[in-house]
Amino acid sequence: MLEADLVNNINHYLEMKGIRYSNELRMGIGISDITLNFGANRRLKPLDDYFLVSILAYVNKKRKVTFFDIQEMFLLGLEKVKQYVFTLANLGLVVIKNTLVKIVKNIFSVNLGTTISIEAKLKDWKGACLQAQRYLCFSDYSYVALPSETIKNVDLSIFQESGIGLLSIKGKNIEEILPAKESVSCDYILKYISTSKVIEKNVDVEKRHLRANVFTSYILT
């Protein structure tokens, strides 16, 4: 078995359960094999640039700012600031009048649901656990997925201390060996970006009926 086969088995499980997911989500602090989401608004505005979302959050907080304010806050050149601001304006999120930037639409009250990331490995559970911890910056929960025959080699205390959950994969079935703990370091902006990427990946997918699954306890009601 290859790691790609393990990931494909997990993908199949998620599809059969009607769960939205994305593979190899690039977040700058690691690439999660699988990121899934429950409960986020399907009309979430897709924004995948950290500075873009950060600038929007800044304008939203201040209600109106100047190009200079943004330059000073984010230490960016004027042309770069204009590029970001005009992108936000084209999306209908801000309006520009001379050098003044005003918020038009607050997207930060939107429901982001629950985001879970998974690192899949065949044997290297220690490395996988370390990698999964990085995902807690943009996920509510993080798991390591291993083939069922590898589980016996794992020191569960390391997972318990780090808050990383553990999944056993056998064929296309998933069993939760250890539940994950909720992240205390999840950054809202990073979560917005990761969640919007999952939503964007599934925008053309017909809404599926969500079935009971190994992650059911995390589904928002």
Label each region the model flagged.
Residues 1-38, 47-100, 221:
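Acidic-basic catalytic patches of nuclease active cores, encompassing PD-(D/E)XK
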Residues 10, 34-40, 114-122, 142:
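Conserved catalytic cores of phosphodiester-cleaving nucleases, focusing on short active-site segments
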Residues 12, 18, 26-28, 39-54, ...:
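Non-catalytic C-terminal interaction segments of nucleic acid-processing enzymes
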Residues 81, 103, 128, 151-152:
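Amphipathic coiled-coil/heptad-repeat helices and related helical stalk/stem segments
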Residues 99-110:
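Accessory beta->alpha helical hairpin/"wing" motif in late/C-terminal subdomains of nucleic-acid enzymes
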Residues 124-125, 139-173:
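Nucleic-acid nuclease catalytic cores
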Residues 132:
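Catalytic core segments in nucleotide and nucleic-acid processing enzymes
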